[in-house]
Structure formats: C-alpha cells, structure tokens
C-alpha cells in the first residue's frame, strides 16, 4: 500500500496566532475522504470534506466538472488563491494515491476487480480550551471495516488484520508516524486556531435547544413520551429520561444527533410508559447554550373552559338565528317579487344560477 504523505499546508499567516489564546470548550478539525471503485465505469470517485467542529468548511469531488477544493463556509472564502491552489493540489494527489491503494488492497485480500470497494480516511486534531493539542487522528477503513490507525501516542500504529499488518510494517520502516505527528502537532493546530478566529461568529456561538415533549399512545395501556431538542448548536447535547428521579437510560430510545440543514441540530429521546403514569417522568436536557440543565415533562392538553353542553346550546342558538335570517330573507324576497309582478319560483331559479350568492348573503347576516 502506498504511504500517504501528510497534508502539509503552508501557513499563510501574517503572524502566528498566540498559543495562549483561549476558547470556550474544546474544538476539532477533521478531514473525511471516501474513495469508491466503479468497475467498468471509469476511475474511482474521490470525495473529501473538511469540518471544523460540526460545520463543513471545504469540499472536493473528483466527479465535478472542474475538480477543485471549494469553500463551504463564509469565513474560509477570505483565504487567498494560494490556499485553494494548494488544497486542490493535495486533494488531487490523494485521489490518485487512493486509486493505487485500491488496487493494492485487492491483492492483499485476494479480491476480484469486478466488485465495488471503498477506502475511507479520517485525520485531524482536537484542541483544548488553552489552544493546545488534545488528540490527533489518522485512520483508515476498507470496505466499511477498520484497517489501520495511528495510536494516541502519535508514534505507532494499530493494524486491524493480517493485511493491515503489511501496511503497518511498511509505514514503520518509512517512519511515517513521525511525519504525521509533525502535521498534527503543527500545521493542523495552527489552521484550526486560524479557522476558530476567522469563523468565531459561527463556530464559537452557542444556540440553546428549543424543547418540548410529545405524547403518542401505543395501546390502551401504554404511551410513548418523546423529548425533543431542536435548533441547537454545537451538536453536543445530553437528553435523559427519569422516573421519580431515577435514570431510565436502559429503557430509553435515543437517536443520533441530526443536522437540520440550517447549521443547527436536532435530537430526541423516547420512553414507553404506562398510561396514567406520565406525570412520573421528566426529561433532562444539558447543552452548552443553557445556563443550567433544563427539566421538562409532558403537559396534558388543558380542558375546554366551556362545558360541552354549553357548546351544544350555543350551536343550537346560532342555528336558530341563521334559520330565522334565511326565512326572513325569503319572505322579504317574496314580497319584493310580488310587488314587481314576478313569482317566488322565478326568483329562486335566478339565485341558483348565480352560484354562491346565497352563501355570501347568509354570511353577511
């Protein structure tokens, strides 16, 4: 397997950001790429996306009419042409390398070229509140399974199987971990700091979730309570259900946090309860945008303030009023037509021909 050279981006900085600068919480920059073979349909497709925290900021697609790294966030659009030329060059080089890697892995696993295969690659760095490296990443997967990964010490590799051990030996001989460590501790950290500074209005904001609980009957004896958190940023959030103060994690259905398409996220957690015991359950929400954890429960819809019999009586009265108005209108029209020498039946035929005039007249009454 060909050794992937680390992405060495030139620091296009007039002055390096201070190491002592701080940010609220930890932050990350990750690049994700996928290479998919297409037997009989041309070269494999290569797609690469970059994220700062939960926000995509760059994207490359080898199938584009003019393949190049493109901005996906407003703050990165201000980078100069040198940045985009270098990013595009690196992505094209990675695409070519992974095409070779696909062929190599077919040999390692004794597979036919007739099938579809994928290589996934993820690398990046996490930054602490003090602006220093927390963790570096560099890992591969083949056909959806772990292949090889750089360990937390950034000096050694973990191979998932015998085929990956071949790559591990090659990379150990070439001292590939040293180059990757230099990138993660240097270039990756510096660019993440730069993105956090340039995109701070978007990346360092905290939008609290909008929360509510919905009630869904399952049977005559059970119902599902679903706790919703909508429109929050960043994506990290905790939803838990409690019954009389005790966590219900084992009985709770929890979906993955999902993007809403407008730069925020949504999530829900559900629990099945016995009908009549809904009041015993509370949903607890923790998020960076909330000053303190928030607790809510399902509130049954309020009862109507007017009794049912009262509503029936009111409707009966309204019906009588409308009926009286219609009768009065008919009698008035009959008298009017008699004065003109016409008949009531002629007037009725004339009204029906005008379509909605009767309804319009009735509404006015």
From Swiss-Prot:
Region (Connecting peptide): 299-308
Modified residues (Phosphoserine): 356, 359
Gene Ontology, cellular component aspect: early endosome membrane; ER to Golgi transport vesicle membrane; external side of plasma membrane; extracellular space; lumenal side of endoplasmic reticulum membrane; MHC class I protein complex; phagocytic vesicle membrane; recycling endosome membrane
Any matching Pfam family: C1-set
Record membrane topology: Single-pass type I membrane protein
Cytoplasmic side: 333-365
Residue ranges, annotated region (Alpha-2): 115-206
Region (Disordered): 337-365
SMART domains with a match to the protein in the record: IGc1 (SM00407)
Residue ranges with Polar residues bias: 346-359
Coiled coil (residue ranges): none
Bilayer-crossing regions: 309-332
Location(s), subcellular: Membrane
Broad class of where this protein is predominantly found: membrane
Keyword annotations from UniProtKB, A to Z: Disulfide bond, Glycoprotein, Immunity, Membrane, MHC I, Phosphoprotein, Signal, Transmembrane, Transmembrane helix
Disulfide partners: 125-188, 227-283
Family (UniProt): Belongs to the MHC class I family.
Binding partners and assembly: Heterodimer of an alpha chain and a beta chain (beta-2-microglobulin).
The protein's name: Saoe class I histocompatibility antigen, C alpha chain
Organism name: Saguinus oedipus (Cotton-top tamarin)
Classification lineage: Eukaryota, Metazoa, Chordata, Craniata, Vertebrata
């Amino acid at each position: 397997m060909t050794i992937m050279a680390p992405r060495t981006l030139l620091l296009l900085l007039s002055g390096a950001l201070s190491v002592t600068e701080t940010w609220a919480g930890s932050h990350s920059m990750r690049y994700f790429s996928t290479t998919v073979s297409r037997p009989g349909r041309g070269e494999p497709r290569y797609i690469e996306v970059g994220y700062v925290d939960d926000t995509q900021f760059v994207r490359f697609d080898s199938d584009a009419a003019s393949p190049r790294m493109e901005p996906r966030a407003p703050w990165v659009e201000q980078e100069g042409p040198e940045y985009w030329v270098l990013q595009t060059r690196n992505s094209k080089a990675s695409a070519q390398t992974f095409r070779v890697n696909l062929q190599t892995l077919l040999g390692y696993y004794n597979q036919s070229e007739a099938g579809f295969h994928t290589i996934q690659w993820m690398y990046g760095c996490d930054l602490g509140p003090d602006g220093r490296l927390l963790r570096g990443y560099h890992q591969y997967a083949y056909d959806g399974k772990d292949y090889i990964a750089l360990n937390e010490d950034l000096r050694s590799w973990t191979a998932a199987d015998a085929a990956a051990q071949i790559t591990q030996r090659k990379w150990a001989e070439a001292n590939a971990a040293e180059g990757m460590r230099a990138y993660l501790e240097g270039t990756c950290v510096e660019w993440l700091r730069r993105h956090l500074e340039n995109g701070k209005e978007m990346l360092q904001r905290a939008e609290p979730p909008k929360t509510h609980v919905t009630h869904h009957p399952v049977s005559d004896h059970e119902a599902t309570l679903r706790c919703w958190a909508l429109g929050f940023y960043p994506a990290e959030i905790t939803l838990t259900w409690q019954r009389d103060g005790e966590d219900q994690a084992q009985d709770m259905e929890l979906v993955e946090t999902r993007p809403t398409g407008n730069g925020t996220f949504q999530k829900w957690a559900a629990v099945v309860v016995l009908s009549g015991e809904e009041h015993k359950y509370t949903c607890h929400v923790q998020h960076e945008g909330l000053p303190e954890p928030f607790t809510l429960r399902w509130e049954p819809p309020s009862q109507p303030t007017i009794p049912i019999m009262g509503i029936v009586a009111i409707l009966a009265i309204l019906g009588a009023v409308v009926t009286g108005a219609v009768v009065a209108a008919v009698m008035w029209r009959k008298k009017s037509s008699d004065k003109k020498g016409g008949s009531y039946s002629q007037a009725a035929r004339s009204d029906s021909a005008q379509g909605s005039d009767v309804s319009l007249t009735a509404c006015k009454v």
